[in-house]
Amino acid sequence: MVHNKNNTILKMIKGEETTHTPVWFMRQAGRSQPEYRKLKEKYSLFDITHQPELCAYVTHLPVDNYHTDAAILYKDIMTPLKPIGVDVEIKSGIGPVIHNPIKTIQDVEKLSQIDPERDVPYVLDTIKLLTEEKLNVPLIGFTGAPFTLASYMIEGGPSKNYNFTKAMMYRDEATWFALMNHLVDVSVKYVTAQVEAGAELIQIFDSWVGALNVEDYRRYIKPHMIRLISEVKEKHDVPVILFGVGASHLINEWNDLPIDVLGLDWRTSINQAQQLGVTKTLQGNLDPSILLAPWNVIEERLKPILDQGMENGKHIFNLGHGVFPEVQPETLRKVSGFVHTYTQR
């Protein structure tokens, strides 16, 4: 076990005094790291996530290299879907491809439930390796949100307009709600197992929910999100972060959820979120494209985010989306160091 652990991110969420604004980066573990790219010459994503020693190594790298205040488990949001009967393949340059998309209620009924100890022991073993050995910051576990998982399962892969997903919602509510309920059950078990293995925070990625308007979110998604988060919190008092992209119109709906942290993409500033009435700890939200700019531009864009965060008093610095593969590791190291220095109390 680690002594003198850096719990800055947990203190920030609890409203306790911190020495600086905590920082971590979505997709910090993986594609921007030379060590990871070398591994990918030999192993696929699923190969790495199925080998706890390799997965723990990749998860730990950014903490060592960038001095982040949290680690996020290296895995894919598709991980819990394979065991329940989803034939998923990660294709380079495309993303997840589903070979047996959901079309009918019978397709939903064919899905099995997840038993994390039996079906994803490698995920739990990775967490145990990290938390029982030398990780000196909290570990973030995660899951995809029901809508985002369902959209992949219905569309058969990434989509620009989610026509098949919306068509199912509007045309076949029975199938839609059956799928939502099944995915909530899977997610609760999956997330709970991660916490029991040692994860100290959970992030829910609802990457594509911005495709819905407020009315549809309230009818088709919100009750299921409330159930998912509430059932996890009934079992363990773990902080929950929610993040989505292009969904500023849903901010007030998210603020109603029993989450602890609301992640902002780069389109909505911290001040704007406050003006909209958000009361949660805020996470974000540098445009990841800025990391490809010269350092003077990066610093110029960092300062207002950090100033607004310090004024708000409850802020975790992050990007407004994941790290691009083209970002230089030294840039991430400099950003992390700048956040720590600039916000030092």
Swiss-Prot record:
GO annotations of cellular component type: cytosol
Annotated positions for site Transition state stabilizer: D76
Pfam families from the UniProt entry: URO-D
Gene Ontology biological process terms in this record: protoporphyrinogen IX biosynthetic process
GO molecular function (one): uroporphyrinogen decarboxylase activity
Catalytic reaction list: uroporphyrinogen III + 4 H(+) = coproporphyrinogen III + 4 CO2
This enzyme's EC code(s): 4.1.1.37
Binding site for substrate: R27, Q28, A29, G30, R31, F46, D76, Y152, S207, H321
Pathway of action: Porphyrin-containing compound metabolism; protoporphyrin-IX biosynthesis; coproporphyrinogen-III from 5-aminolevulinate: step 4/4
Keywords: Cytoplasm, Decarboxylase, Lyase, Porphyrin biosynthesis
InterPro entries to which the protein is assigned, alphabetical: UROD/MetE-like_sf, Uroporphyrinogen_deCO2ase_HemE, Uroporphyrinogen_deCOase
Keyword Cytoplasm set for record: yes
Location in or out of the cell: Cytoplasm
Main location (coarse class): cytoplasm
CDD domains: URO-D
Complex and partners: Homodimer.
Family the entry assigns: Belongs to the uroporphyrinogen decarboxylase family.
Biological role: Catalyzes the decarboxylation of four acetate groups of uroporphyrinogen-III to yield coproporphyrinogen-III.
PANTHER family recorded: METHYLTETRAHYDROFOLATE:HOMOCYSTEINE METHYLTRANSFERASE RELATED, UROPORPHYRINOGEN DECARBOXYLASE
Name of this protein: Uroporphyrinogen decarboxylase
Annotated source species: Staphylococcus aureus (strain MRSA252)
Organism taxonomic ancestry: Bacteria, Bacillati, Bacillota, Bacilli, Bacillales
